[in-house]
From Swiss-Prot:
One of its GO terms (molecular function) is malate synthase activity. It comes from Ricinus communis. It is an enzyme of class 2 (transferase). This is Malate synthase, glyoxysomal. The active site is at R182 (proton acceptor), D468 (proton donor). The lineage of its organism: Eukaryota, Viridiplantae, Streptophyta, Embryophyta, Tracheophyta.
């Protein structure tokens, strides 16, 4: 495909990295022949067009986030406070009908855009695979570009992987899951691609390259005339959804496909966004296929939103489940809102990993998954997330047994009772205890996750759970909150206050434990010490950084030719 408007007249510039690029685009990532098939001149022109058209609106949206943060830090509370959009909240309107290809989304599997993962996930028996450029991926140049190559091969049906260690070749089955792609959030830059001298917006790179190369094959092979399909993360306001809607419309126009072809599910994973669900769906009404409970990031956002409110300390994060009043209210309101507007209400993640060496523990873990999924389906959710193929049969069984033969519950479960959920319901303080073990677990998991992320892995199995960046974020902000306000511990640490000294002792103990668990050799070779410094610096910062990954990103940026400055 080629832009008629650009043709062959657009100036070609060869950068030091060896890629042919249009005017104003500079690539600082390593040259690779396979990457060059993705980073074509026309594809880069499309990304540059998106960047130039939307960069000022993106900047404004990020500034608005900062203003909202200042208001919350001054004591304001988030709420349904927008009189200008009252007509949207109270009006009777629906989103465009759900495409038949994705009517049934009972179980969705998620994972990074790695080659073997993509094949296994598409073959897993799940209805949908969400391929992730966001929290499950460390956004190194190699990971991002290989991910684009892998997705192109997956959409074309040609993807295969030879596992030399097992001498096994992985290929796609005849029946595969529908593919959704999650680009990065608005706040993350792509430092390896400069447009007019500035780093590109990460999500526009992820979306633009994937859409440009795959929309035609996707609509033919996967979407039955619709698509491509996306998941959109980390939004805090409907103005951000409006930008995405405009991006989709521009992409559809460029490709010459009908308006409303592209479809997206928005993750409601920030506290401000829960008060904007109607508005978010309204902005995307021609392109929406629902909302999803991104519950781990939602808890992280709760702490971040109330960072200047010492009266809202979170209990141990393991106690902040969906039965907490503010979490249940969020889930119920999401179901009611989605079904009222005619779209899917997706449940949250089951992060458990099968425990192969302990059948009793494995059985108990699966029972927890079943219980959680039963709660979701009875609450009216149309589907759910799983992090591991081994969980899919259990999740599918629970949803299928409780939904009859219907693909979803959009008409069957209106949840009118949730219409009365108040602002107070959505921000009610969570109940529970704060323990020394909670502080230890946060520290142990946060450091290990960050060490993996710095060495290129964004989806990390830890203590029988598949963890992504959301877990590290909760761990970090909770430690920060407890330290900032000198929280008094319960349980074993009864009466002990969280101080710099206590955190220092905990870090020392947990680093020794990590070394014992992973072994001296791996500990020495890994980036545990660097991760520890970064994690402790974040926990002890006088003001809370918005995102751990934003702070850590410069550590994985490698500019070519070597010696180019980092951001």
């Amino acid at each position: 495909m080629r832009y008629d408007t650009y043709g062959d007249s657009a100036p070609i510039k060869k950068t030091g990295a060896g890629y042919d690029v249009p005017e104003g685009v500079d690539i600082r990532g390593r040259y690779d022949g396979e990457f060059a098939k993705i980073l074509t001149r026309d594809a880069l022109q499309f990304v540059a067009d998106l960047q130039r058209e939307f960069r000022n609106r993106i900047r404004y949206a990020i500034e608005c986030r900062k203003e909202a943060k200042s208001r919350y830090n001054a004591g304001a509370l988030p709420g349904f406070e927008h009189p200008a959009t009252k007509y949207i909240r109270e009006g009777e309107w629906t989103c465009a009908p759900v495409p038949p290809a994705v009517a049934d989304r009972k179980v969705e599997i998620t994972g990074p855009v790695e080659r073997k993962m993509i094949i296994n996930a598409l073959n897993s028996g799940a209805k949908v695979f969400m391929a992730d450029f966001e929290d499950a991926l460390s956004p190194s140049w190699e990971n991002l570009m290989r991910g684009q190559v892998n997705l192109r091969d997956a959409v074309n049906g040609t993807i295969s992987f030879h596992d030399k260690a097992r001498n096994r070749v992985y290929k796609l089955n005849d029946q595969i899951a529908k593919l959704f792609v999650r680009p990065r959030g608005w706040h993350l830059p792509e430092a390896h691609i400069l447009i007019d001298g500035e780093p590109a917006t990460g999500c526009l790179v992820d979306f633009g390259l994937y859409f440009y190369h795959n929309y035609a094959a996707f609509r033919r092979n996967q979407g039955a005339g619709y698509g491509p399909f996306f998941y959109l993360p980390k939004m805090e306001h409907s103005r951000e959804a409006k930008i995405w809607n405009c991006v989709f419309e521009k992409a559809e126009k460029m490709a010459g496909i009908e308006r409303g072809s592209i479809r997206a599910t928005v993750l409601i994973e920030t506290l401000p966004a829960v008060f904007q669900m109607n508005e978010i769906l309204y902005e995307l009404r021609d392109h929406s296929v629902g909302l999803n409970c991104g519950r781990w990031d939602y808890i992280f956002s709760y702490v971040k939103t109330f960072q200047a409110h010492p009266d809202r300390p979170l209990p141990d994060r393991v106690q902040v489940g969906m039965t907490q009043h503010f979490m249940k209210s969020y889930s119920d309101l999401l179901v009611w809102t989605c079904h009222r507007r005619g779209v899917h209400a997706m449940g949250g993640m089951a992060a458990q990993i099968p425990i192969r060496d302990d059948p009793a523990a494995n059985k108990a873990a699966l029972e927890l998954v079943r219980k959680d999924k039963l709660r979701e389906v009875k609450a009216g959710h149309d589907g759910t997330w799983a992090a591991h193929p081994g969980l899919i049969p259990a999740c599918m069984e629970v949803f299928a047994n409780n939904m009859g033969n219907t693909p979803h519950q959009i008409q069957a479960m209106k949840r009118e009772d949730a219409a009365n959920i108040t602002e107070e319901d959505l921000i009610q303080r969570p109940r529970g205890v704060r323990t020394l073990e909670g502080l230890r677990l946060n520290t142990r998991v946060g450091i290990q996750y960050l060490a993996a992320w710095l060495t290129g892995t964004g989806s990390v199995p830890l203590y029988n759970l598949m963890e992504d960046a959301a877990t590290a974020e909760i761990s970090r902000v909770q430690n920060w909150q407890w330290l900032k306000y000198g929280v008094e511990l319960d349980g074993d640490g009864l009466g002990v206050k969280v101080t710099f000294d206590l955190l220092g002792r905990v870090v020392e103990d947990e680093m020794a434990r990590i070394e014992r668990e992973v072994g001296k050799e791996k500990f020495k070779k890994g980036m545990y010490k660097e991760a520890c410094k970064m994690f402790v610096r974040q926990c002890a910062a006088p003001t809370l950084d918005d995102f751990l990954t934003l702070d850590a990103y410069n550590n994985i940026v490698i500019h070519y030719p070597k010696g180019s400055s980092r951001l």
